[in-house]
Amino acid sequence: MYRALTWWFLAEGADTGDAALIAARAAEPSIEVSADPDDPWTRVNGRDVSRDIRTNEVSAHVSVVARVPAVREHLIRRQRAIIASAGQGIVAEGRDIGTVVAPAAQLKVFLTADPGARARRRAAELSADAGETEAAQARRDRLDAAQSEKAADALLLDATELSLDEVIGEIARLARERCLLACAGDKSS
């Protein structure tokens, strides 16, 4: 959601460094996210921006936007509402989901990976330069260090050598262990 809001400010030509402007306009766009794992999308004012929000340009500005207290308050409220409305549970991702947004979550996984591996994955996703992507991610990691702390009760999962399917499989296994996914007669464990 932070990326979607940042994308919107950039599309509007707004100065993302103007905290007063960002605070005043943070609630203007309609930001929707899909909770369906088979059909993930992010929309801003009805436009699908799922790919647009993953660019290096958005990455370069999102930390500045996310640090504005009014933005954090607004989006944390929105994230909590989405989680609360999910009924049977939801998989949520973000730098402070387990520590701020949903500290009482039944399963928290702190996903990490070697910076080079993260950059290669993002660059492949965007058809971008891996070196430029790694530099942008390193800048964001430095800016977002406070929001990237592992919750005391979170499990650490290093995905450096894992494929996306392997990461999903491991998280599903952890959820089954805690009976957060079907347990009775579940033969997929």
Q: Where do the model's predicted regions map?
A:
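Generic secondary-structure signature for well-ordered alpha-helical cores
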Residues: L10, A14, I31, R142, ...
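NTP-dependent small-molecule kinase module
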Residues: V44-S50, F110, A117-A128, Q147-S189
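ATP-dependent NMP and nucleoside kinases share a basic, alpha-helical "lid"
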Residues: S50-A66, A70-E125
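N-terminal phosphate/diphosphate-binding loop that engages ATP/GTP or pyrophosphate donors
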Residues: M1-R54
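Short, residue-level hotspots on alpha-helical faces of the histone-fold
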Residues: R3-W7, R77, A81, R173
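Residue-level signature of catalytic and energy-coupling elements of molecular machines
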Residues: G46, L75, V91, Q137, ...
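Small-molecule kinase domains that catalyze NTP-dependent phosphoryl transfer to phosphate-bearing small molecules
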Residues: S34-D36, Q79-G87, I97-A104, A128-A172
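Amphipathic alpha-helical transducer elements in NTP-driven molecular machines
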Residues: Y2, A19, V68-I76, G94, ...
